[in-house]
Amino acid sequence: AGWIGAIFAPAAEIMRAYPGWAAEDVEKLQAMFRRAFYPQLDRASSWNGNVDLTQIDAMMAIAVFNEDIELFNAGIERWQKRTHSYFYLESDGEVPAISGDGNNVQSFWSKPTAWVDGLTQETCRDNGHHAQFAIGSAIHAAEVAWHQGVDLYTGESERYTATLELMATQLLTGDMQGTCADNTASKSLFDTWEVAYNHYHNRMGIDLPQTRALIETKIRPNAPRAVWNLAYETLTHAGF
């Protein structure tokens, strides 16, 4: 429901004004989302945080298409809570409890060896698809909100830019920078980066040298495979 909803709902919003799509057909799709997707997205996942963030992305995109303010606001609330329990800043101190952590944050975070700015709940699980999917979905949700006039980005700029730069450094160097017992970074790359870079660098003017280097040397030239809801970022947000 998360990955599919995060694709279907934005596509439906783009197609809403298509003259060949009758109003009753739009209403049928809205009803399908309410019937099939709402129950699946209604509560926070107790799995790892990338799953919940994907659900939040879908939830907010569907809320826009369905013109459902209550669902949209619930998505924002979930986004804010998960952001603080998934993306770490040293200034946070203790990580807040979250559904699924088993009352053991150290184990839930796969036993980091250093709690540093930009660490994620799944950095030490793998900083391949799990951690990259998580930040991709979180940023997609923030972008949905941005286009509805709600700025989720600015209040969490330190948190998200730290995550981008740490993860990009790890992926560029192949070295986890001492954050995990296994110091070898993933070689898997996904189209996770352009939306965040576009906002924080192009809109806000924040320097993100490692993120830029990763995008320019690894992401754009190699066209990472599209997977689930990570598919379109360079096309829509690279600013070509």
Name each region found by the language model.
Residues 152-240:
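CBM-like carbohydrate-recognition segments
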Residues 1-148:
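Aromatic-lined, polymer-binding surfaces characteristic
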